Amino acid sequence: MSANIRKKGELLVPLPIVLVTSFSCHRNKNQLLLIFAAKVRNNWDFLYFRSKFVNTMIRRAEIKDIPGIIELLHQVNMVHYVLRPDLFKPYTTKYKEQELETLIDDDSKPIFVFEDGAVLGHAFCMITEVKDDKLLQDIKTLYIDDICVDEKARGKHVGKALYEYVRDYAQSIGCNNITLNVWDGNDAALSFYKNMGMKVQKTTMEIVL
């Protein structure tokens, strides 16, 4: 079986002839690669695509990222406000600039950002550890306090890349699990986390009086 290598974008990468039934997404520290295989005129054409995200990086947040993070926090808050205007105030953020400056240096509450010339996504995390508890087993947990993708970058797998980065980070520091909360009615977020393999741990009940 012969293989023709077709260039799409800036790079041309020779690939071994393998059986590929669909596309695959490959990530390194600087770029996302999409590789497709298609049978054309009885030959296999391997189409190499350089992702739109050419200079992407997921890393710990820095002071310079604060304006972008605040913009994302506004987007998150508006989602929550639309869901529960009886609980959330509009046009505000969970953290202010000074609070973010402190959080950025807190290793127990790491903030990660997805950068592509601008901050396109963030993940606020908290590391907690239970030891010698009367009821609970010893356990180290990474809690995702907030994860957001810029509304202009949604549908481009930014959230998936962020989540997988956080998952790998949690494993690297010896966490036993990852937890987070999803508001009822936020169906898109619930579906996303289920697709990432997460399952319901507990349910918070409410009655409004």
Model-derived features: positions:
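A short helix-loop-beta-strand connector motif used in the catalytic cores of GNAT acetyltransferases and
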Residues: 98-112, 143
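Conserved beta-strand in the GNAT
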Residues: 113, 118-127, 148
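Conserved beta-strand-loop-alpha-helix junction that forms the acyl-donor binding cleft
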Residues: 179-189, 206-209
